[in-house]
């Protein structure tokens, strides 16, 4: 029990100040305002679905992929080995900039990624959870854009 409390306290202390999960409609509005609705032919619903399955709408999310050793950053879990930081840095952005809750750098980098030959298929989680979904409309239910 003591170990559990210590681990809980440590995880609380390591949570970045100001880190918060964004609401679904907040994410939709920010992505819409950032010009992602039908960008390269992909509806806003696809982008919101991707954001949910990649980060659960957490713009501060950082997850390491144990399979390839890369780390994903931010709302869309953009990988450091190719798109940001010290890797190929095809987005010309620091990985930590992708953790900003204003999503400006995240949206600009996502636009570069989706312009590539794979489109949104560059995110395998989108292909698995969003691409063939017949309920994409639900991602914008009740959102005032």
UniProtKB/Swiss-Prot annotation:
Its main location: secreted. Expressed strongly in testis and in epididymis, and weakly in brain and lung. Detected in sperm (at protein level). Residues 20-145 form the C-type lysozyme domain. It comes from the Eukaryota. It is found in: Secreted; Cytoplasmic vesicle, Secretory vesicle, Acrosome; Cell projection, Cilium, Flagellum. Pfam families: Lys. Belongs to the glycosyl hydrolase 22 family. This is Lysozyme-like protein 4. It comes from Mus musculus.
């Amino acid at each position: 029990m003591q170990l559990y409390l210590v681990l809980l306290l440590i995880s609380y202390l390591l949570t970045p100040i100001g880190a918060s999960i964004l609401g679904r409609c907040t994410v939709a509005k920010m992505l819409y305002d950032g010009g992602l609705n039908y960008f390269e032919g992909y509806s806003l619903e696809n982008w919101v679905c991707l954001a949910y399955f990649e980060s659960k709408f957490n713009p501060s999310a950082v997850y390491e992929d144990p399979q390839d050793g890369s780390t994903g950053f931010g709302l869309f879990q953009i990988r450091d080995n190719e798109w940001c930081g010290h890797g190929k840095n095809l987005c010309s952005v620091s990985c930590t900039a992708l953790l900003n809750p204003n999503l400006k750098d995240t949206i600009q980098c996502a636009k570069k990624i989706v312009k590539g030959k794979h489109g949104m298929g560059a995110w395998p989680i989108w292909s698995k959870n969003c691409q063939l979904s017949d309920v994409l409309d639900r991602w914008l239910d009740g959102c005032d854009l």
